[in-house]
């Protein structure tokens, strides 16, 4: 007679074994109707799971995060159900849940079209309205394999053949005539599957291997209620408006092309933006006692073998061969920085030893993973490495966090997510050293008064790390900064220092970055600001426009003066109406526009307006320069103009 303990501590006794759904029905019909799955003694199970012994039970509904994931997974099966009805010869591969949605990879004799996607979505909507039961059957693996063979589902057969020999049975889920394989859980009935949208079509290699056949991927999203779905679709629409690839073209910042996949062609305006970010970071590092270095792009494989990268990372490295030697284009800077550190024996008095480089790295990312300037093969990092003693870790991490906050604030980011990743099962170094490092990182976060999340087991094999992620204007989270403790590489590459007692010791190395990839960070800035950069970052801070040719010479004098004084000014003397020019430069997000007519020439003044349409009136060029300087010094995203004449 099982006794079921519910989350509120109440108990219910049953005379016979019961399913999760039967417990929900015993509590009330409303809960039963909303039930998606259950959690028995901490383990997620299907609603049909039988409970024979005393247990703790939570009923999972669509209001629970796990419930939403189950709804999404079940919608992936519905994609399979609909596709097989509409395109019987299609073969289903895999259909997992992803962040805020799901996808299904499918093999079919021709490419799916947008019309096909609409037809599949329509069929899914028809299927869910029938409120059919989803039936789970645990099936011996040989029998399940034969069923997929009989149905011509070669990808499912391949998945079964890859299973561990200890696997005796698999879960088969039946959506009426459609059958799919999954460990589950899945919804008990399609009545809880209502709010969804198929989003797009894409290509994907089977098993993610470019040597395998290309499949077709159908992406979708699903939510517990209509409001959540609408909110998501609104966020997606807003994200598309802010897409850095579209804005990069519209604002003439950069482009990428097939002849150099994953590598950026920076245009003049984009390169000015890039340089503004780099020069700002360079000055910040100099102000915080980092020594900037420059290390080679191509290094003999011997160094990469010593560092461990050749064995663990070789497939992602670009390599070359010359004069019977193998080389790799560096995918990261750390081994080279240790070579700089090793030039001349260091004393404990030299530590902490802070080194920085705007290092150009190349990584052979899969072509399908490339995305504008957010995911590239060639990128530059604000890379830094700090060599410390074990006792210096916490202080250095605390100072790094302070610096990171200054930088993010200047770029307009104040919503930061902090995650501490701790020791994995496979690691180097003693537990005692890991204890010290993890304690140092956590205390640095605590001393800064930060709320942070621990990710057990997610640290690198060589040490724990803190990751810093930014939330942008529409709530998306971007991982940017990091600081990682490394016990391994200094030992592998022979880094040492002379301790206070005269003995040779190995320093701990802290890998750190604040913006990370400059390309990716600029992509984030573009999307977060929608291209309306704060004045200090704007590629063009002011544009000077004449009304007629009579003002051309005066405009040229103004442009030369502003550029000579360190501002980024542009001259527009085109024979166009002034309203047309203003509109064009407003769309180009230029912060300030100077309009010059005969009156301004006569009085040696300028008429100023902002990209938001605010008319600031007429002022001297000196006053305008003061206004610009004030905006640049404040580094605020908001144009708050205070004019003192």
UniProtKB/Swiss-Prot annotation:
SMART domains: tRNA_SAD (SM00863). Binds 1 zinc ion per subunit. One of its GO terms (biological process) is threonyl-tRNA aminoacylation. SUPFAM superfamilies: Class II aaRS ABD-related, Class II aaRS and biotin synthetases, TGS-like, ThrRS/AlaRS common domain. Its cofactor is Zn(2+). It catalyses: tRNA(Thr) + L-threonine + ATP = L-threonyl-tRNA(Thr) + AMP + diphosphate + H(+). HAMAP family: Thr_tRNA_synth. Homodimer. This is Threonine--tRNA ligase. It comes from Marinomonas sp. (strain MWYL1).
């Amino acid at each position: 007679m099982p006794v079921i303990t519910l989350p509120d501590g109440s108990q219910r006794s049953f005379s016979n074994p019961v399913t999760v759904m039967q417990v929900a029905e015993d509590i009330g019909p409303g809960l039963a109707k909303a039930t998606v799955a259950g959690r028995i003694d901490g383990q997620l199970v299907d609603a049909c799971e039988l409970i024979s012994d005393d247990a703790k039970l939570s009923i999972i509904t669509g209001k629970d995060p796990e419930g939403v994931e189950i709804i999404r997974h079940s919608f992936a099966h519905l994609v399979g159900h609909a596709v097989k009805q509409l395109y019987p010869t299609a073969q289903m591969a895999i259909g997992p849940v992803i962040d805020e949605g799901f996808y299904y990879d499918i093999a079919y004799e021709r490419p799916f079209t947008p019309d096909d996607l609409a037809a599949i979505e329509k069929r899914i909507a028809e299927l869910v309205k029938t409120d059919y039961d989803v039936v789970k059957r645990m099936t011996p693996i040989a029998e399940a394999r034969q069923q997929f063979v009989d149905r011509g589902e070669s990808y499912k057969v391949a998945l079964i053949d890859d299973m561990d020999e200890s696997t005796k049975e698999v879960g088969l889920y039946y959506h009426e005539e459609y059958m799919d394989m999954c460990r589950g859980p899945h919804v008990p009935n399609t009545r809880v599957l209502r709010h969804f949208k198929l989003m797009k079509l894409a290509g994907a290699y089977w098993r993610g291997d470019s040597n395998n056949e290309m499949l077709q991927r159908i992406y979708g999203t699903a939510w517990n209620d209509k409001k959540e779905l609408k909110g998501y679709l609104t966020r997606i629409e807003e994200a598309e408006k802010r897409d850095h690839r579209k804005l990069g073209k519209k604002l003439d910042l950069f482009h990428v092309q097939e002849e150099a996949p994953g590598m950026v062609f920076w245009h003049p305006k984009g390169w000015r933006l890039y340089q503004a970010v780099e020069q700002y970071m360079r000055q910040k590092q100099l102000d915080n006692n980092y020594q900037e270095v420059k290390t080679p792009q191509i290094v003999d494989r011997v160094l990469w073998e010593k560092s461990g990268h050749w064995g663990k990372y070789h497939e992602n490295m670009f390599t070359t061969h010359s004069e019977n030697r193998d080389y790799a284009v560096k995918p990261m800077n750390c081994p080279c920085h240790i070579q700089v550190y090793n030039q001349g024996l260091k004393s404990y008095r030299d530590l902490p030893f802070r080194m920085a480089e705007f290092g150009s790295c190349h990584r052979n990312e899969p072509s399908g993973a490339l995305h504008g300037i957010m995911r590239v093969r060639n990128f530059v990092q604000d890379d830094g490495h700090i060599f410390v003693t074990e006792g210096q870790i916490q202080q250095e991490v605390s100072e790094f966090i302070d610096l990171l906050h200054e930088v993010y604030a200047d770029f307009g980011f104040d919503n930061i997510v902090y995650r501490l990743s701790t020791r994995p099962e496979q690691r180097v170094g003693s537990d005692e050293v890991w204890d010290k490092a993890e304690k140092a990182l956590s205390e640095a976060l605590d001393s800064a008064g930060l709320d942070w999340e621990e990710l057990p087991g997610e640290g690198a094999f060589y040490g724990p790390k803190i990751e810093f992620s930014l939330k942008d204007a529409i709530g998306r989270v971007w991982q940017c900064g990091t600081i990682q403790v490394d016990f391994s590489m200094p030992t592998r590459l022979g880094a040492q220092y002379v301790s206070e007692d005269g003995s040779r010791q190995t320093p701990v190395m802290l890998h750190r970055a604040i913006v990370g990839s400059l390309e990716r960070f600029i992509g984030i800035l573009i999307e977060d600001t929608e291209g309306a950069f704060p004045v200090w970052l704007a590629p063009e801070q002011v544009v000077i426009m004449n009304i007629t040719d009579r003002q051309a010479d005066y405009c040229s004098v103004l442009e030369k003066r502003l550029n000579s004084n360190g501002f980024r000014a542009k001259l527009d003397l085109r024979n166009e109406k002034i309203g047309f020019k203003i509109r064009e430069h407003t769309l180009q997000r230029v912060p300030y526009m100077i309009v010059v007519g005969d009156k301004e020439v006569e009085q040696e003044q300028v008429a100023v307006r902002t990209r938001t349409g605010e008319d600031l009136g007429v002022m001297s060029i000196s006053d305008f320069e003061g206004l610009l300087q004030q905006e640049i010094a404040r580094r605020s995203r908001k144009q708050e103009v205070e004019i003192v004449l």
